[in-house]
């Protein structure tokens, strides 16, 4: 969690100091749009959004899983996207890093794909930004009830488990708010924990 806070701060500093941005980091109310994130101003594909969903793609895959043995039962149904982002300011965005650990069979493998290589996923691998916005994920794990439970956690341990998906991880098919954020956006690199910073939303 500390890493995410630092990353968000560094991102905001870069916007201000290198790009001339005068405002503050916008706040996104996850529960407000949990029924359909693609209708939020942040993801509606308009010129002021962070672009929209990907084109319909990857028809040979009917669901995505969380790429870890800790969550074999969580199967995320394919949404209405999966292909390249086609609208908004980042429709021509290029993703170059990864994949490292993706469950999508629609992502071209990285030139360094041997899982025993310490540089796995670090080879130059240019491709389009892909998204498969999942209201199935957001409606279950970023809704009002989940966020209130998280904020009302009695201690840091409970907060951590509510954020990350339980103890043990993903017990009872519980994804947690943090993991759900990744898989609400989905696609590539959004659903690859190791390269997800390349998904700017």
Please name every model-derived segment.
Residues 1-201:
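C-terminal accessory segments of proteins
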């Amino acid at each position: 969690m500390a890493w995410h806070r630092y990353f968000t701060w560094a991102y905001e500093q870069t916007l201000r100091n290198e790009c001339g941005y005068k405002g503050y980091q916008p706040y996104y109310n996850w529960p407000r749009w949990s029924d359909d994130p693609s209708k939020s101003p942040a993801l509606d594909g308009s010129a002021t959004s962070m672009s929209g969903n990907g084109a319909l793609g990857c028809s040979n895959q009917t669901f995505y899983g969380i790429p870890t043995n800790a969550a074999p039962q969580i199967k995320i149904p394919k949404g209405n996207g999966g292909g390249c982002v086609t609208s908004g300011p980042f429709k021509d965005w290029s993703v170059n890093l990864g994949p490292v650990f993706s469950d999508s069979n629609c992502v071209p493998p990285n030139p360094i794909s041997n899982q025993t290589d310490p540089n796995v996923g670090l080879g130059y691998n240019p491709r389009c930004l892909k998204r498969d916005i999942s209201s199935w994920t957001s409606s279950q794990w970023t809704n009002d009830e989940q966020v209130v439970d998280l904020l009302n956690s009695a201690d840091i341990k409970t907060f951590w488990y509510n954020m990350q998906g339980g103890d043990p991880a993903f017990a009872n098919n519980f994804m947690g708010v943090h993991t759900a954020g990744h898989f609400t956006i989905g696609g590539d690199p959004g659903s690859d924990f190791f390269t997800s910073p390349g998904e700017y939303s």
